[in-house]
Amino acid sequence: MEKYIKSITALNDLALQLKSSNQNELDRFAESDIFWSVNKSKPSSRNVSKGTIYQFEFGKNYIPEMSYEHRGLVIGVSGKLLYVLPICSYNAKYADHRNAYHPVHNPTSKSHFFLLKSSEFAFLKHDSVLKLNDIRSVSFSRIKYRQPNGFIDPKSSVYQCIEKIVFSKYFFNYSFQYDKLTAENQRLTSQLQQLQSEKQAAEEKLQALKKLVAHVETDAEIFSNF
């Protein structure tokens, strides 16, 4: 009980600070606690698949971790845990947002953000960014609701691009070796195709020569009979 009283006192002190400096965070702080207390023990029977966009309650976390209620893209499902990339609103005041990766408009960016343009995704009312370096492992119980039209097809080039960048950020050495082997495989495949093409051309020439030889031999046999 003593530890609980200390925690309540600390939270109350923080709430008083936020009340005077950041009322919005205080409200989200409270909503997070309420959601946790209501849903902590509730069973979840959702069927969740990769590529789906949900509204999540990420809870209270340290900066720069994503906190409170935000959208998130599910990129993996393991038992009752989801692997989620948080989504937040695009803010031109932030250099990282302005330099966010986009497969068409900014394909060389090494930013930790991926630009999702509202003109390209039906579930967005305004431009947003995926936070690529803050993948979250969360319970199904953190889901508040599914975003209307919230889906990025895992077979699409955009989703596969997102997945590849995330893979490279979290497993750089493995990703580097994978890309190296992929490039080598492409080189060898191209070389094999070239050799097969040359082989086919050589076989066609050989067949033509055989026909020519057969024709000459036939003519020679005819002349020898005169």
Predicted regions and their residues:
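Short, charged beta-turn/beta-strand-edge "cap" motif at the junction between a beta-strand
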Residues: 59-64
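Loop/turn positions that initiate beta-strands
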Residues: 50-51
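C-terminal terminal-subdomain/extension
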Residues: 1-32, 102-226
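Structured loops at beta-to-helix junctions and adjacent beta-edge loops in soluble globular domains
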Residues: 57, 87, 133-135
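Compact nucleic-acid interaction/catalytic patches
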Residues: 65-118
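Short alpha-helix capping/helix-loop boundary micro-motifs
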Residues: 37-43
